[in-house]
């Protein structure tokens, strides 16, 4: 699909360049049935307000060509402020592995959620539709009436629900 309405337009451009560059570097796609190949997933995140992009390349094993691939994308897309190699060498269909290799100065992007600055790492849960999440969190805050109460945000990912109530709790 050349155009996906569920993602920012720039993701299609980055993906096309990712495929072109990886093909030129002879990086092969991972085959789940044979457990052969390098590239498992391309995972992109974009801050709704900041415009910052995180590039996460999920691989079966780290090879030098992955850094070259990342460097070329970083050169072409200044919006990419975070580039991470995630190594998943297990025979599983789970997307992310345990090992992360950070190729930039940070492993996260910054954005704003409900007037709070948040840092979003590749493994952190974060709502993909920021305006809808802000409306949902506002309704949850109205319902919870956190005025003067202690708010526990358990199993929270990036912590945005608790942060959205912090000013009134």
Where are the regions that the model predicts?
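Accessory RNA-recognition modules of RNA-modification enzymes
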Residues: 1-169
């Amino acid at each position: 699909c050349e155009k996906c309405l569920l993602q920012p337009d720039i993701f299609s451009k980055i993906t096309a360049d990712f495929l072109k560059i990886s093909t030129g570097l002879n990086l092969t796609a991972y085959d789940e049935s044979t457990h052969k190949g390098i590239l498992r997933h391309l995972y992109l995140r974009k801050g709704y307000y900041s415009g910052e992009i995180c590039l996460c390349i999920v691989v079966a094993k780290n090879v030098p060509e992955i850094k070259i691939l990342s460097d070329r994308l970083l050169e072409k897309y200044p919006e990419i402020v975070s580039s991470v190699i995630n190594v998943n060498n297990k025979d599983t269909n789970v997307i992310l592995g345990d090992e992360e290799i950070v190729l930039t100065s940070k492993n996260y992007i910054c954005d704003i959620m409900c007037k709070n600055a948040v840092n979003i790492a590749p493994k952190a849960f974060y709502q993909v539709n920021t305006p809808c999440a802000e409306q949902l969190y506002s309704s949850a805050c109205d319902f919870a009436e956190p005025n003067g109460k202690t708010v526990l945000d358990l199993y929270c990912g990036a912590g945005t629900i608790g942060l959205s109530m912090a000013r009134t709790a």
